[in-house]
């Protein structure tokens, strides 16, 4: 059971949420008094409480979602709060639904979406994974961070062929290496205020690091927001090549490192928005004509469940008509379907841009 001090903090946080009438987070929408009372004393076997789940959303009332999972068990123990939020965010993934088994599908179905190189600047596909037997960020000890990094770096050092590369720990990193990784846009920074409030940045930079292959087309982030972020990317529009590289890497790593998986929710991640396939396939794409007709752009995006962001990701502007466009759906469909939907949508956008 949660201790009295934790419950007192929770009561205070709940009052703050209640009073915040202009707060639009999913946390506020779904944390009713009944649900709050039924969950406030619960504690996972690793010691996580409802406070770990909601504290970021309580501190940052402008959160979109407002909750994180401190460990894998939290998704089950605090399901009365997680499930409706997951259903709301992953539109159509009902509380009775079950995420399908992993299926990367026929990788030959993916192509170069822009063979002339007119529209697509770069292509990237990533997924997140959590290592079985370890909690997520807020509950990790410094020793666990280091132990995980050791496992990850030794696993990655076994990669061969195109995936062969080097691991760079953030701890003790020289200024030169740091600058080089920043210039390549590889280095991740300490978390933003949402992650800070969720206690996702403790013992920084212990256990954090970056692996990349010699061609700089394959990247693994260790202990950033998730235990592992596996990323395949390159200039141009060859989605097929990018996807195939990611799939072979994930399959290879999976043989050596068991990942946390949930029967109903698929692969588990720290933030419920990334559950399921955890896959985000994206392009940086120049669409000057559609940029001038934002309504049409949004209409096509909605039809193919695409998310349109500014050039530098969430909450940024499209610089020079360049957008970051990705698949929106991660749950209730396979990896293949998620990326195929994105490919179809991008092909359609290019077709319309050409016709305008």
UniProtKB/Swiss-Prot annotation:
Entry keyword set: Acetylation, ATP-binding, Kinase, Nucleotide-binding, Transferase
Taxonomy, superkingdom: Eukaryota
Residues reported in the UniProt entry to bind L-arginine: 64-68, 225, 271, 314
Binding site for ATP: 122-126, 185, 229, 280-284, 309-314
All residue ranges annotated as the Phosphagen kinase C-terminal domain in the record: 119-356
Modified residues (N-acetylalanine): 2
UniProt xrefs under PROSITE patterns: PHOSPHAGEN_KINASE, PHOSPHAGEN_KINASE_C, PHOSPHAGEN_KINASE_N
InterPro entries reported in the protein's UniProt record: ATP-guanido_PTrfase, ATP-guanido_PTrfase_AS, ATP-guanido_PTrfase_cat, ATP-guanido_PTrfase_N, ATP-guanido_PTrfase_N_sf, Gln_synth/guanido_kin_cat_dom
Assigned EC number: 2.7.3.3
One MF annotation (Gene Ontology) recorded for this entry: arginine kinase activity
CDD domains from the UniProt entry: arginine_kinase_like
Domain Phosphagen kinase N-terminal, first and last residues per copy: 9-91
Family according to the record: Belongs to the ATP:guanido phosphotransferase family.
Name recorded for this polypeptide: Arginine kinase
């Amino acid at each position: 059971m949660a201790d009295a001090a934790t419950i007192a903090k929770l009561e205070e946080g709940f009052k703050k949420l209640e009073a915040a009438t202009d707060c639009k987070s999913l946390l506020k929408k779904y944390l009713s008094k009944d649900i709050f009372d039924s969950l406030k004393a619960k504690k996972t076997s690793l010691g996580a409480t409802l406070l770990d789940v909601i504290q970021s959303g309580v501190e940052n009332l402008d959160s979109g979602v407002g909750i994180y999972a401190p460990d894998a068990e939290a998704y089950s123990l605090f399901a009365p709060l997680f499930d409706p939020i997951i259903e709301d965010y992953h539109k159509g993934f009902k509380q009775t639904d079950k995420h399908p088994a992993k299926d990367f599908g026929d990788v030959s179905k993916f192509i170069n979406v822009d063979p002339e190189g007119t529209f697509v600047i770069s292509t990237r596909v990533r997924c997140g994974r959590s290592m079985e037997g370890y909690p997520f960020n807020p509950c990790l000890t410094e020793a666990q961070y280091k132990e995980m990094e050791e496992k990850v770096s030794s696993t990655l050092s076994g990669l061969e062929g195109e995936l062969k590369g080097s691991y760079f720990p953030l701890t003790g990193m020289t200024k030169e290496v740091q600058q080089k990784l920043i210039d390549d846009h590889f280095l991740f920074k300490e978390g933003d205020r949402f992650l800070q409030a969720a206690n996702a940045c403790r013992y920084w930079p212990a256990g954090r690091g970056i692996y990349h292959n010699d061609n700089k087309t394959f990247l693994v982030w260790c202990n950033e927001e998730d235990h592992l972020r596996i990323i395949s990317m390159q200039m141009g529009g060859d989605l097929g090549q990018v996807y195939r590289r990611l799939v072979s890497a994930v399959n290879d790593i999976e043989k050596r490192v068991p990942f946390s998986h949930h029967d109903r929710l698929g692969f588990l991640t720290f933030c419920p928005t990334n559950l399921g396939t955890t896959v985000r396939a994206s392009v940086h794409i120049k669409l000057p004509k559609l940029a001038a007709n934002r309504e049409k752009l949004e209409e096509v995006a909605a039809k193919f469940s695409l998310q349109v962001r500014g050039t530098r990701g969430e909450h940024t502007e499209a610089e020079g008509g360049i957008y970051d466009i990705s698949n929106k759906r991660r749950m209730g469909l396979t990896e293949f379907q998620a990326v195929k939907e994105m490919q179809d949508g991008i092909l359609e956008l290019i077709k319309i841009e050409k016709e305008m």
